[in-house]
A protein has these predicted regions:
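Active-site catalytic loop in hydrolytic enzyme cores
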Residues: 1-61, 70, 76-79, 83, ...
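Short, intrinsically disordered low-complexity segments
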Residues: 12, 88, 96, 150, ...
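A periodicity- and composition-biased signal for non-globular, repetitive helical segments
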Residues: 19, 103, 165-166
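CN hydrolase (nitrilase-like) catalytic-core segments centered on the catalytic cysteine
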Residues: 50-134
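Conserved catalytic-core subdomain
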Residues: 140
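A conserved C-terminal secondary-structure "cap"
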Residues: 144-166
Length: 166
């Protein structure tokens, strides 16, 4: 994790995908949120997205924005990030790889389509699936810090933790 002051910490991918389980160990650092220039940034890497607990934990810890660097090959993440942002009222930036890679007998087709998703599920920017793309979006951090869905419902405070399995 890098800020204007330099390297401040690191994050280790928690959930390994496919043959990564043969070569790597899952990350063993607790999920954290980092304050960078007034924004609270949470990180999840690639396949971490498929586990809703990752985004929920980042939201509970106060993340305004989830940074999500990825090498996605499954076609589901970009649509799922709409839900992750909506259910946690956070912004997310998925920076995904494009192109193809052959590793031995395995062929990987990366889905591209990097995107910036708003706290309300609106896609603020969507990249092409097959070419490099750089974009930015202005975000209002007050929106991600307000977990009220309406005047009666708060997405964090209304959780019934005693009813859930861990």
């Amino acid at each position: 994790i890098v800020s204007s002051k330099g390297v401040i910490d690191s994050y280790r991918k928690i959930h390994l995908y496919f043959k990564e389980k043969l070569w790597f160990s899952p990350g063993d650092k607790k999920i954290e949120v980092f304050e960078i220039d007034g924004a609270k940034i949470g990180i999840m890497i690639c396949f971490d997205w498929i586990f809703p607990e990752t985004a929920r934990t980042l939201s509970i810890l106060g993340a305004d924005i989830i940074a999500h660097p990825s090498n996605l090959v499954l076609p589901y993440c970009q649509k799922a990030m709409v839900t992750r942002c909506l259910e946690n009222r956070v912004f997310a930036i998925t920076a995904n790889r494009i192109g193809k890679e052959i590793r031995g007998e395995d062929n990987f087709n990366f889905t591209g389509a990097s995107q910036i998703t708003s706290y309300n599920g609106k896609i603020l920017s969507s990249a092409p699936t097959n070419k490099p793309f750089v974009d930015f979006a202005e975000v209002d951090l007050k929106k991600s810090r307000d977990k009220k869905l309406n005047r009666f419902n708060n997405l964090i405070k209304d959780r019934r933790k005693e009813m859930y399995l861990s």
